């Protein structure tokens, strides 16, 4: 079944994702306040009292829980006194900008570049040379292609990044000139320079009624782009558990599983991002390592393993069930009525998937708070959590007393 869960890359700009999330939040009645700053908080057994500075002056908010989703410089994390150990490097300079390139350099067949004296540069890939890294990314809807370079142990020019500085960097990395012009359109236009980088992981993701998600809990290299998925999965994992707490249906310890499930995943992503950062660096030693990895990736099993690591499909939570699918990402199954499992997941509820056409939904799931919504597809049975992970699975075709009891235990243990 896991083979039927296709994984692929979607080239969606982050600003578009943020726009969609904001629109959905507004549909659900969420009030989004901009220009407001958290200045302090205190917590007790019943909730958290926030001190906030706003355009009209300071005010307070009382809430049951506080979630810090405020980025790598998280004020919530700092005020909570949660340590953020890790490493800071100062050996790289990354330059990125929207910039126009001469039309004659663009290969219409590939969408990449074909530079005289150098050759083809595929789009969207990290193009490594012995002098650095170059990326050409003609993102759909962008005002101009995104041009990026990264150099190691290079003296930084003082002041903000300019197109002339980026052009000079690209020439050093590629060894040939490439003319860069200002982007067209109204923007927003990116022009950014980053010196060094941080790889850090919060010592803990929870302090009483204060919780951290996304970059507030972990920062790392953007190589491979795992950060967005990691942060969204944090939010979804925490979201349904907080909802159960708010409804009063959460079993004891459910909220504690947020950290026990998500922090190991973040540790693995940090490890992966550091490995990828090492593999893009210049140098003959790295070139040798890359040659070895190329040989290893000739084996489709290794390709799959890396793909699952990058996508997060290799994550398996400890859910107290010994079935091979338990704790794994549920495959996006097609149901008998033509809908897919991913469509059902939008309602934020658990779902009991009956592959046999039997009566797994009765009575084990009946009468429980937040009980699963039965669906039928031709196979055995899965209980899928609101975040899309399998809470329980069985190979038993006909429900018996033992299997019904295990399903009921899974419902109470993980879903309230």
Residue ranges and their predicted role:
Residues 1-4, 19-29, 43, 168-172, ...:
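Helical substrate-recognition/capping region of FAD-dependent monooxygenase/halogenase enzymes
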Residues 1-290, 294-297:
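Core Rossmann-like FAD-binding/catalytic domain of the broad FAD-dependent monooxygenase superfamily
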């Amino acid at each position: 079944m896991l083979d039927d869960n296709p994984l692929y890359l979607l080239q969606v700009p982050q600003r578009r994702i943020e726009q969609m999330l904001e629109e959905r939040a507004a549909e659900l009645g969420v009030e989004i306040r901009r220009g407001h700053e958290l200045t302090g908080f205190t917590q007790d057994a019943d909730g958290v009292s926030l001190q906030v500075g706003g355009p009209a002056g300071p005010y307070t908010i009382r809430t049951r829980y506080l979630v810090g989703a405020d980025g790598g410089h998280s004020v919530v994390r700092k005020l909570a006194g949660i340590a953020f150990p890790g490493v800071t490097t100062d050996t790289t300079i990354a330059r990125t900008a929207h910039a126009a390139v001469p039309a004659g350099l663009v290969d219409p067949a590939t969408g990449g570049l074909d530079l005289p004296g150098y050759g083809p540069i595929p789009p969207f890939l990290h193009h490594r040379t012995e002098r650095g890294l170059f990326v050409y990314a003609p993102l759909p809807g962008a005002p101009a292609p995104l041009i990026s370079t990264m150099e190691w142990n290079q003296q930084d020019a003082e002041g903000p990044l300019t197109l002339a500085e980026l052009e000079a960097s690209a020439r050093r990395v590629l060894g040939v000139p490439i003319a860069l012009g200002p982007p067209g359109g109204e923007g927003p236009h990116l022009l950014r320079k980053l010196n060094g980088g941080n790889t850090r992981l919060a010592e803990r993701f929870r302090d009483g009624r204060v919780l951290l998600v996304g970059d507030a809990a972990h920062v790392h290299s953007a190589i491979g782009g795992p950060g967005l998925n990691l942060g969204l999965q944090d939010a979804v994992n925490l979201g349904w558990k907080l909802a159960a707490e708010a409804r009063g249906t959460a079993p004891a310890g459910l909220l504690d599983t947020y950290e026990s499930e998500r922090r190991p995943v973040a540790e693995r992503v940090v490890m992966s991002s550091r490995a990828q950062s090492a593999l893009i660096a210049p140098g003959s030693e790295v070139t040798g390592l890359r040659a070895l990895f190329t040989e290893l990736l000739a084996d489709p099993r290794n390709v799959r393993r890396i793909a699952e690591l990058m996508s997060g499909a290799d994550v398996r939570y400890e859910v107290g069930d010994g079935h091979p699918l338990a704790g794994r990402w549920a495959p996006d199954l097609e149901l008998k009525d033509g809908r897919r499992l991913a469509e059902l997941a939008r309602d934020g509820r658990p779902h009991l998937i009956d592959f046999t056409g039997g009566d797994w939904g009765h009575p084990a799931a009946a009468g429980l708070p937040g009980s699963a919504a039965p669906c039928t597809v031709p196979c055995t049975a899965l209980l899928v959590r609101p975040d899309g992970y399998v809470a329980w699975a069985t190979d038993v075709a006909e429900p018996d007393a033992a299997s019904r009891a295990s399903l009921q235990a899974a419902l109470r243990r993980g879903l309230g």
